[in-house]
Structures are given as C-alpha cells and as structure tokens.
Amino acid sequence: DLDVGEMYTKTELFFERNKKAFSIAAVGLVAVVAGLLGYRKFVAEPRAESAQEAIWKAQYYFEIDSLDLAINGDGSYPGFLDVASSYGSTPAGELANFYLGVCYHQKGEFETALNYYKEADLDDDVLRVMAEGNQGDALVELGRADEALAHFEKAANMVRSDHTTPMFLMKAGILYTENFSLDGGTATL
C-alpha cells in the first residue's frame, strides 16, 4: 500500500539532503546554456558574416572563369583557399570547399578536387547532392569506377529532385554498363 504522505516526505528529505548538489547542477546548466548562446551570438554569427564578406570576390572570379584567382585570391581579396582555411566551419567556408572542388576538377586535379568535395559539409540540399555526385565524377576520372558508382547512387538517392536524381541515376547506369554488366545497369536505372 502506497502512502502518499510518506512518499512526499521521503522525496522532500532527499531534495533537502542534496540541496547543494542540485543548486550546483542548476548553476552549471545555466552557465553552459549561457556560454553556448554567448558563443553563438558573439563568435559564430559575426564569424559567419565575415566569411560571407570574404568569399564574394572569389565567387566573382569563379564566375568569369579565372580559376587561379578564385582559388588563391588577387592580393587584395582572399581566394577560396583562404576562406576555407580561415572560416571552414561557417556556411561560407564550407561553400568555399565546394568551390575549390569544382575549380580543381576543372583544372584536371581530380584527387585534390575529391578531397575538397569531401570537406564540403553543405546545408543546401542541391549543393550537398552535387558535392556527392561530383565526387563520383572525379573518381571516374581517376579510374575508380566502383567507388564512383557508389557516389552516383548515393547522390541520386539523397534528395529526390527532378534535376539531380535522374542525372546521377543516368551517370550510374552509364558507368555500370560500361564497366560492369548490362543486367546491373538496367537494374540501376
């Protein structure tokens, strides 16, 4: 038989005996939450804004096909390498890694491109899928068809899209039929 009064008294005694520990835990929790909020407001957000301001000129050089200037900067403005190394954990820093992958891919430096595609941890669904699929493209160029196939299939299934899903399924199918067996290629499509 459960006595509510006795149970209440035991609970009350437990809290009374451990009041100091509960107070320390509560203060610690408040300090951690305040620290996280402060870090976000006073460190992470300003850093993300600085990164966004730093990347624009490199993006411009990329758009006009000046890959070396996009990668290394022009002396007055940083290139993607500087943005990625200085602001790597920000959205603009992650985007710089993606751009570096594309730049090195276009320059024919496929292993370097592959490394930067892997580094790009992007929030945007389309860019995340493209980074995955572009890894497959770089692996094809490096003659690693089996690894490329896995990346194409992963990219095709990451986010359903009228653009990226059929594109990467087609790449997977073509790669499969050229390097493996026709039956598997048909099954992939």
Task: Kindly label every feature range from the protein language model.
Residues A21, E45, A84-G93, K107, ...:
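Short solvent-exposed coil/turn linkers within tandem alpha-helical repeat scaffolds
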